[in-house]
Amino acid sequence: MAVPKRKKSKSRRNMHRSHLGLVAPNVVIDPTTGEYKLSHHVCLGGYYNGKQVAKSKV
């Protein structure tokens, strides 16, 4: 089993974990339907950037 040769300091441990934090999703209000959706994604109505690009899933 691998064992560290030297103790990792709290600072180095925390720097190692700096990329593990969760990021909140970028949620915006869709101007065509008025519902919440992820930014830069097609809404459930099939609209993207004010234009219908896919069939509606609703």
Swiss-Prot record:
**Source taxon at top rank:** Bacteria
Q: Does the keyword Ribonucleoprotein apply?
A: yes
Family listed: Belongs to the bacterial ribosomal protein bL32 family.
InterPro entries documented for this protein: Ribosomal_bL32, Ribosomal_bL32_bact, Ribosomal_zn-bd
Taxonomic lineage:
Bacteria, Pseudomonadati, Pseudomonadota, Alphaproteobacteria, Rickettsiales
Keyword Glycosyltransferase applies: no
Q: Which Pfam families match?
A: Ribosomal_L32p (PF01783)
GO BP, sorted A to Z = translation
Q: Supply the name of the protein.
A: Large ribosomal subunit protein bL32
Which gene name belongs to this protein? rpmF
Task: Write out the GO MF terms.
Answer: structural constituent of ribosome
Which NCBIfam families does the entry mention? Answer: rpmF_bact (TIGR01031)
Keyword list, A-Z: Ribonucleoprotein, Ribosomal protein
Q: Name one GO cellular component term.
A: large ribosomal subunit
